[in-house]
Design a protein with these regions (language model features):
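Cap/lid segment of the alpha/beta-hydrolase catalytic domain
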Residues: 148-172
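Conserved alpha/beta-hydrolase "acid-adjacent" motif
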Residues: 268-273, 330
Length: 359
């Protein structure tokens, strides 16, 4: 799900662009060698300028990194009285388009906002279908926002969680996403203490960054198959972090309530990253807490659920480790991409966690 290619870096000019391209080419060549996708010499073929060969070989690497089946963008089924509208937000850090789902049930009073960050190669429409979050919004009367990554800022539509310029408050993509969220809050008069963010893969990694950078804005985080904030500072360290090697972690002063889902068969983002998100979420938390572990089954898959409570008995962190699940949204809808219909319903459990009375 999280893929990188030569064109994924933000476009620059002159020497800066050339330097980035050379660095990316070198990284790709070394990565291709690691995955057995190079010639016998251990380097990409050098006929011509090598760019076509590099793109072709990189496509093979992307195929290795992605689950079977490409992304799908089936049409969303919108109930009468509901709205699924596209808009755009612009600030000094840049512009992003987004879709907002306002359920028909909102006329009875809006309960909150869930910001959903898609994974690489996905679209807001696809992610909405795959997670089934709009149906839950109808049931619980909350608004859903689906920001869309620009292909001009990442060629594979990945959120740039591995870029230093996109990991801090009021800079880069966090600034854009926070501003976008505030705009929706004001437009729909959403309760300020019921704003949450969730994501899949690269989207989950960015959701974790947002939870740490804006604890005053996002009151809980849902991370599915993601990585901790600060896990990488560039593409090289991103690959290491995804493989479960040498992952960094940004210190956190304010704990953010977090629910984590990860498959123990995830070959794209190593499951150790889920545990790292949990540790990071608990940093700066209360001195005393209780933890419970339970082994259960749902939807044809076994899973281990670890719950950490704060000193007041409120759920602070949940960690769902799902047996046999790969790099896909647990309990998702088959019509969407990167979903697995088996296992516990990640969307429903995130909504329960977000809107629990103790939140």
């Amino acid at each position: 799900m999280i893929n990188f290619n030569v064109g994924a870096w933000r476009p620059t000019t002159g020497q800066a662009r050339a330097a980035r391209l050379a660095s990316a080419n070198d990284l790709v060549t070394r990565t291709l060698a690691q995955h057995g996708l190079t010639s016998g010499s251990g380097t990409a073929s050098s006929h011509g300028d090598g760019s076509e060969t590099m793109r072709s070989a990189l496509s093979g690497l992307m195929a290795r990194l992605q689950p079977d089946g490409g992304p799908a963008t089936p049409p969303a089924d919108i109930p009468a009285g509901a709205a699924f509208a596209e808009d755009a937000f612009t600030c000094a850090a840049g512009t992003r388009r987004y879709h907002t789902y306002v359920p028909a049930s909102a006329r009875e009073g809006i309960t909150g906002l869930v910001v959903m960050l898609h994974g690489c190669t996905q679209t807001p429409e696809d992610f909405a279908v795959g997670t089934g979050m709009n149906a839950l919004a109808e049931q619980h009367r909350f608004v859903v926002v689906y920001p869309q990554q620009s292909r001009g800022d990442n060629a594979q539509s990945c959120w740039n969680w591995f870029s230093r310029g996109d990991q801090m408050r009021d800079r880069g993509e966090p600034a854009i996403l926070a501003g976008l969220t505030r705009e929706v809050i004001a437009r729909h008069a959403i309760p300020a203490d019921k704003v949450f963010v969730a994501g899949l893969s690269a989207g989950a990694a960015m959701a974790v960054i947002l939870g740490g950078a804006y604890p005053d804005l996002f009151h809980a985080v849902g991370a599915h198959s993601g990585l901790p904030a600060g896990a990488a500072k560039d593409v090289t360290s991103a690959f290491s972090a995804m493989a479960g090697r040498e992952a960094g972690s940004a210190p956190r002063d304010t704990p953010t309530r977090t629910i984590v889902f990860h498959g123990d068969a995830d070959a794209t983002v190593h499951p150790s990253n889920g545990a790292a998100i949990v540790r990071q979420a608990l940093e700066g938390g209360p001195a005393q807490s209780l933890q419970t572990d339970a082994e259960r089954a749902a939807g044809g898959r076994s899973y281990r659920l670890s719950t950490t409570y704060d000193a007041d008995g409120a759920e602070a962190v949940e960690h769902w480790l799902i047996e046999g699940l790969g790099h896909a949204w647990s309990g998702g809808q088959p019509a969407g991409s990167y979903t697995d219909p088996k296992g516990p319903d990640a969307s429903a459990e995130m909504v329960r966690f977000f809107f629990s009375p103790s939140s």
